From Swiss-Prot:
This is Lys-63-specific deubiquitinase BRCC36. Belongs to the peptidase M67A family. BRCC36 subfamily. Its cofactor is Zn(2+). It comes from Xenopus tropicalis (Western clawed frog). Metalloprotease that specifically cleaves 'Lys-63'-linked polyubiquitin chains. Does not have activity toward 'Lys-48'-linked polyubiquitin chains. Component of the BRCA1-A complex, a complex that specifically recognizes 'Lys-63'-linked ubiquitinated histones H2A and H2AX at DNA lesions sites, leading to target the brca1-bard1 heterodimer to sites of DNA damage at double-strand breaks (DSBs). In the BRCA1-A complex, it specifically removes 'Lys-63'-linked ubiquitin on histones H2A and H2AX, antagonizing the rnf8-dependent ubiquitination at double-strand breaks (DSBs). A motif (JAMM motif) lies at residues 92-105. One of its GO terms (molecular function) is metal-dependent deubiquitinase activity.
Length: 261
């Protein structure tokens, strides 16, 4: 197996979970940016949320243009951090279904590994209810594909996934989180314009489609934009409070230093 383990930063993991919980009707996807060390351990530092051109309940696809754009973003991060950043994997959600990859997922993963043997796949299973406690659960897994011994098909191999705690939210992950509402809005606009451009629709149908479009945007504002804004405001308040505490500590230390002098 090419990869021994995967370490994902806590703030990047948070963006993946938030993106996965943004919709329970279709699967969502994104790309992982990071580096691979000499011990064949993949370190994921940030993620890129991808815009879906075709919404499907049980399938996601990454276009060559999106992969190229992600590579460009990885190069930009490499210049900023001075580390060899690249696209090291992909993630997608499994709403209401098992966390294990489907045959399509395994074949897709095998295709990516043909380009990079260190490429990994992450799956987030969400909107799953525990039958005993009646509480929601989020399950996640990391995998690669290998050729089956007595078959031409591929099979999955689970890769250990470790979430690395991170006390702060780095700028690159914060930008990805803030980008989520805009991407979801663009997806709704694309779907509405595609349907609205059909010439055979009557006036009542167009009015209905417009109402559905407005309803979906309001739902996104309530479920995504509102909580995200509240979270950012709470985070800002915490940072300001912490800054005041550090300033007070600094002044106290300066006074003690002055007394010693």
């Amino acid at each position: 197996m090419a990869v021994q383990a995967v370490h994902i930063q806590g703030d990047a993991f948070l963006v993946c979970v938030t993106h996965s919980l943004s919709t329970e009707r279709e699967e969502v996807m994104g790309l992982c940016i990071g580096e691979v060390d000499t011990q064949k351990v993949v370190h994921i530092h940030s993620v890129i949320i991808l815009r879906r051109s075709d919404k499907r309940k049980d399938r996601v696809e990454i276009s060559p243009e999106q992969l190229s754009a992600a590579t460009t973003e990885a190069d930009r991060l490499a210049e900023i951090t001075g580390r060899p950043m690249r696209v090291v994997g992909w993630y997608h959600s499994h709403p209401h279904i098992t966390v294990w990859p489907s045959h399509v997922d395994v074949r897709t993963q095998a295709m990516y590994q043909m380009m990079d043997v260190g490429f990994v796949g992450l799956i987030f299973s969400c909107f799953i209810e525990d039958k005993n406690t009646k509480t929601g659960r989020i399950l996640y897994t990391c995998f690669q594909s290998v050729q089956a011994q007595k078959s031409s098909e591929y099979e999955r191999i689970e890769v250990p996934l470790h979430v690395v705690p991170h006390n702060t939210i780095r700028k690159v992950c914060l930008e990805s989180a803030v980008e989520l509402p805009r991407i979801l809005c663009q997806e709704e606009q694309d779907a509405y314009r595609r349907i609205h451009s059909l010439g055979h629709l009557d006036s009542i149908t167009k009015i209905h489609n417009g109402s559905v479009f407005t309803k979906n945007l309001c739902g996104q504002m309530s479920a995504i934009s509102g909580p995200l804004l509240q979270w950012l405001e709470d985070r800002l308040e915490q940072n300001q409070q912490r800054a005041q505490e550090l300033q007070s500590e600094k002044e106290q230390l300066l006074q003690e230093l002055k007394a010693l002098g």
